[in-house]
Amino acid sequence: DCFLKDYGADGCCNEGAQYYRHAGLTLWGCLDILSNVAQDTFSPLFHEPKIKHIAEYICNVHVEGPYYLNFGDCSPLAGRCGAREYRFGQTVGSDALQALAAADFRADADPDHLQNPDGSTHINLWYRLTTAFAEEEMMAYSAAPRHHLTVWYPSAGVYAARQGSWVLGAKFGSNGDSHNHNDTGSITVYKYGKPFLIDIGVESYTKKTFSPQRYEIWTMQSAWHNLPTFDGVQQLPGAEYAAREVCT
């Protein structure tokens, strides 16, 4: 309950795709372990719509190949999906998540599946065992990944749309998110699965990143996103600085 209270009913991770693996996906890990110990108590939680929405978030912000729609501190290269995402999809009954995870796993050129920007992925013994036990299933899973044409997450103001070769991502919401940038209204665009209008994400974390001087860093400022600056005035941080009258 303490974890889930920070999510809206739509399951959006307001920190972005890169942080999904440290948030929703680790929720699955905890519940999976607990349900193996006390099945009657914890297994029913996987039937909760909110948890399924949390699981499928990563599918809905996936563009193509290695790219994800990104905002805030999130990188567009959020890392490959694999066994944990596959099992999460299996547990909540999401064919879309299973298909994405299996396809991503099969596309990995590294036979040991160790090349991931998240270092914990290959040093965590449980993650490695999960991969070993799921590998045969993922290699044989034949369904192709699929995406919704439009997705709207009102809890965080995240929007995604697809038409032909184009993919659009938009960040509405407010400037009060976790790992926030002053990026309300910013957009990213992909064409044929490649970046067209980008969000540069964040530099390497330093002491300043999580200090009162955070918004002195240029990557945090609205002028360095796909946004207008009026008479030299940029956006300010805080939940009160938010999008209004959003139409999707």
Task: Name each model-derived stretch.
Residues 8, 64-66, 223:
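Residue-level signal for pocket-adjacent positions within structured domains
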Residues 182-248:
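Active-site rim segments in enzyme catalytic domains, especially the processed small/beta chain
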Residues 1-13, 117-119, 240-248:
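Contiguous N-terminal and early-domain "leader" segments and peripheral loops that mark the onset or edge
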Residues 1-18, 134-144:
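Active-site lining segments of carbohydrate-active enzymes
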Residues 22-196:
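Carbohydrate-active enzyme catalytic cores, enriched for enzymes
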Residues 9, 15, 71-73, 230:
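Generic structural "secondary-structure junction" signal
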Residues 8-14, 38-43, 176-177, 207, ...:
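Short helix/strand-bridging catalytic loops that position acidic/His residues to coordinate divalent metals
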